[in-house]
A protein has these predicted regions:
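RNA-contacting regions in translation and RNA-metabolism proteins
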Residues: 1-170
Length: 171
């Protein structure tokens, strides 16, 4: 993957000729020096390069496990949704989705270290995370009704930050 840099006097000049939909970019202003005017610097990477990197990363991961994993990458407004398809999804998911979360963390860190961009990545296998979200949502709504009726506090099981965010959004 190659991070490209473009310099210019204004943001419009720097973005000229680039399709914003096809790149991840960061614009920084370089302050003016004694006899020089200020500059605008654009760092960008193409989304196709990131998709290829994700596929290669997962393929190397699969080779180290001696497994075959197919990868589907969908782009959304904030990042990428990656669906892992394998005959042995239980190995990819792990207990309570911990292996899946670890894969997601490693992939996010690898992309962040390589590009310097904070790109959101969501890794899922066999729709495990979406099913878990629905179960969690139903359970939280049920517990909320019980608390409202009985006026007694309820304690929830320990959750990771993503699950806590879902709970806060429901409440």
């Amino acid at each position: 993957m190659e991070i490209k840099k473009v310099e210019g006097k204004t943001e419009e000049e720097v973005l000229k000729g680039l399709d914003i939909k096809d790149i991840h970019y960061e614009i920084t202003e370089v302050p003016a020096k004694l006899f020089k005017s200020k500059k605008v610097e654009l760092k960008y990477i193409e989304k196709d390069e990131i998709k290829n990197y994700i596929k290669n990363y997962i393929d190397n991961f699969a080779k180290s496990l001696n497994k075959t994993i197919n990868v589907e990458i969908r782009e959304n407004e904030v990042g990428y949704n990656i669906m892992l398809i394998s005959e042995e999804n239980s190995i990819l998911i792990g207990k309570d989705g911990k292996t899946l979360n670890s894969i997601q963390l490693l992939l996010h860190q690898a992309i962040n270290n390589l590009t310097g961009f904070n790109i959101r990545i969501n890794v899922d296998a066999a729709n495990y995370k979406s099913n878990k979200e629905r179960k969690l949502e139903r359970e939280i709504k049920r517990i909320c009704k019980e608390v409202l009726n009985s006026k007694i506090e309820a304690k929830l099981d320990p959750m990771n930050s993503y699950e806590r965010r879902i709970v806060h959004n429901i409440l």
